[in-house]
Amino acid sequence: MPRFTSNGITVEYTDNSGEVLAALENAVERGLMACGEAAVGYAQDLVPVDTGRLRGSITYAVDGDDCYIGTNVEYAIYVEMGTGIYTPGGRQTPWAYKDELGKWHKTHGSKPHPFLVPAASNHADEYRNLLKESLMNA
């Protein structure tokens, strides 16, 4: 057991810094997981639903000190950001396309329906409180 002597007083102590650090790391991970779960809920509330595939695909991942929210559905970016004239830097003229039945359609694009960015950014105070609560309970 380490000991320290000064002015005739000897103090013995136990170094628990490893356990304290591990407890803090676990608390941060639990807090980030709580943030991820909350963000997924907010995104699922905001996403437009047709078949439910996009809503059901929204997940989160914790990697170290970071929490990511996202989806693996290929069209999610078009829902989030819009297309054509409705997306920043998008095409500014209408276009035509033929559907699977051979019918032609003219479009300007689709309006954005943000669900990931607002879920991540509009609840910073709540996420901060979730992390704080997790650390306080470590």
Where in this protein do the model-derived segments appear?
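Short, Lys/Arg-rich flexible segments
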Residues: 1-76, 83-138
